């Protein structure tokens, strides 16, 4: 799984380049409003995906329990393995959902109180990290986040120019990590709430599914 804050390789698609060229003429506030709207849309998509994963996990969990009751250990282990894989994807999806929720909230606060330049840089870093993590699970969300990231990066650049200074690279990195850490904590809590402990499962796989987070 890609690590956060790696450079996004690959050329921006034509639609992204055209969209960004148009957006560069829009006001900073308008671009911020669009970024918030698009982030919330992707957050909702991830919430829907997480709900479907939870439902699928419940079905596999119930089959695992029934197989264990009937002493069909091989089948119980098979269903437990399937649950472990679902939970691994579900946790990443929840982490990404929580990170986008936190990012959108930060942008809304910045828009409300005018602290736009200092907040867009860490949000852009968060979006880049989330994109790297989610692309392998839900590619269409990853592609959309790549475009949102381009919009945010251009806005960060323009905001820095308008203020005649940079946006604080060290500070923005610390704030981005804070957002991701909060997302990990929230996702862990959601996992404990909605995914019951497996009655039987290969321990290494189950443990790996619960320990992964943003790196």
Residues covered by each model-derived region:
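Amphipathic alpha-helical coiled-coil segments
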Residues: 86-106, 137
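Solenoid-repeat scaffolds in large eukaryotic assemblies
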Residues: 75-77
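Extended, amphipathic, non-transmembrane alpha-helical segments
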Residues: 52-60
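Residue-level recognition of alpha-helical coiled-coils
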Residues: 62, 69, 95, 102, ...
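Long C-terminal interaction segments enriched in charged/acidic composition
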Residues: 1-48, 117-215
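Acidic, metal/ion-handling microdomains and their immediate structural contexts
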Residues: 48, 52, 69
């Amino acid at each position: 799984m890609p690590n956060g804050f790696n450079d996004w390789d690959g050329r921006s698609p034509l639609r992204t380049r055209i969209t960004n060229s148009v957006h560069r003429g829009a006001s900073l506030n308008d671009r911020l409003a669009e970024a918030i709207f698009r982030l919330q849309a992707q957050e909702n998509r991830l919430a829907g995906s997480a709900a479907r994963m939870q439902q699928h996990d419940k079905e596999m969990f119930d089959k695992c329990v029934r197989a264990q009751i009937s002493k069909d250990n091989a089948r119980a282990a098979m269903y437990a393995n399937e649950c472990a894989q679902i939970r691994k994807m579900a946790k990443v999806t929840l982490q990404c959902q929580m990170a986008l929720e936190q990012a959108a909230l930060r942008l809304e606060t910045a828009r409300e109180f005018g602290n736009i330049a200092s907040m867009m840089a860490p949000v852009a870093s968060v979006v880049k990290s989330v994109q790297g993590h989610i692309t392998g699970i839900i590619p269409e969300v990853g592609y959309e986040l790549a475009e949102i990231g381009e919009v945010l990066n251009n806005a960060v650049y323009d905001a820095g120019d308008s203020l005649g200074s940079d946006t604080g690279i060290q500070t923005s990195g610390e704030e981005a990590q804070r957002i991701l850490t909060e997302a990990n904590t929230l996702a862990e809590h959601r996992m404990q709430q909605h995914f019951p402990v497996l009655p039987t499962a290969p321990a290494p796989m189950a443990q790996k599914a619960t320990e992964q987070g943003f790196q």
